Amino acid sequence: MANPKAKMSKSRRDKRRAQFNARTKPATTVNCPNCGEPTLPHRACRHCGHYRGRCVVNKLAKS
């Protein structure tokens, strides 16, 4: 069985793992059926506040 020769510090470990995350694909986007703006899937639209046909974030109250 392979064993580490020396303890790997948290920063060195995280630097190694960051290389994998940097190479991942860019996030996919879908168009909002309500306003047509590009948005992330399975999340409320940042432009109009709709998700799955319902208004879940009232944009008028925030402004």
UniProtKB/Swiss-Prot annotation:
Keywords: Ribonucleoprotein, Ribosomal protein. The keyword Ribosomal protein applies. GO terms for cellular component: large ribosomal subunit. Residues 1-27 are annotated as: Disordered. Residues 7-18 have a biased composition (Basic residues). GO terms for biological process: translation. Pfam families: Ribosomal_L32p (PF01783). The keyword Cell membrane does not apply. It comes from the Bacteria. One of its GO terms (molecular function) is structural constituent of ribosome. Belongs to the bacterial ribosomal protein bL32 family. This is Large ribosomal subunit protein bL32. It comes from Pelodictyon phaeoclathratiforme (strain DSM 5477 / BU-1).
